[in-house]
From Swiss-Prot:
Residues 1-22, 43-64 are annotated as: Disordered. This is MAPK regulated corepressor interacting protein 2. It is found in: Cytoplasm, Stress granule; Nucleus. It comes from Mus musculus. The lineage of its organism: Eukaryota, Metazoa, Chordata, Craniata, Vertebrata. GO terms for biological process: branched-chain amino acid metabolic process; cold-induced thermogenesis; fatty acid metabolic process; gene expression; response to cold. Belongs to the MCRIP family. The modification Omega-N-methylarginine is found at residues 35, 65. The keyword Cell cycle does not apply. Interacts with DDX6. Interacts with MCRIP1. The gene is Mcrip2. The modification Phosphoserine is found at residues 61, 82. The modification N-acetylmethionine is found at residue 1. Keywords: Acetylation, Cytoplasm, Methylation, Nucleus, Phosphoprotein. One of its GO terms (molecular function) is RNA binding. InterPro entries: MCRIP.
Length: 160
């Protein structure tokens, strides 16, 4: 049987996601003490420090790490950094398939529009219903984008 403690365990209480403020300040003090400017004449021109690179932290370290508390104990939703800025790549076979389907469809459209037909081969036939269904006599197609926009606006006006 499990027992439930009143407070957080030692592991949770001691767990830190970054350095303490005291550690950060002591490291900053060490870096500032050890850092003594070299006379500019001692270094060649390409090795002289610029105003942008000077600072209390070395270039390899970006400073103290920011710590964000979790909301309701849940991890924040993050997207993969590799997926954010990348563009989708297609294989050669995929591009060939797309090109084939596109060319075939354009050929069918030209033949339907009355373009030159090959006498040897059959022409495409567009389906037209000869006897329409009486239940669809009063059918009116809707624009789904417009319908969703109306639903969205209705939700907004009802909430406020």
């Amino acid at each position: 049987m499990y027992t439930i403690t009143k407070g957080p365990s030692k592991l949770v209480a001691q767990r830190r996601t970054g350095p303490t403020q005291q550690q950060v300040e002591s490291r900053l003090g060490e870096l500032l003490k050890c850092r003594q400017p070299v006379p500019p004449t001692a270094l060649p021109a390409h090795l002289q420090p610029s105003a942008q690179t000077q600072g209390p932290w070395p270039l390899a370290s970006s400073g103290p790490r920011l710590v964000f508390n979790r909301v309701n104990g849940r991890r924040p939703l993050t997207t993969s950094p590799s997926l954010e800025g990348t563009q989708e790549t297609y294989t050669v076979a995929h591009e060939e398939n797309v090109r084939f389907v596109s060319e075939a469809w354009q050929q069918v459209e030209r033949q339907l529009d009355g373009g030159p037909a090959d006498e040897s081969g059959p022409r495409p036939v567009q389906y037209v219903e000869s006897t329409p269904d009486p239940r669809l006599q009063n059918f009116v197609p809707i624009d789904l984008d417009e319908w969703w926009a109306q639903q969205f606006l209705a939700k907004i006006t009802n909430c406020s």
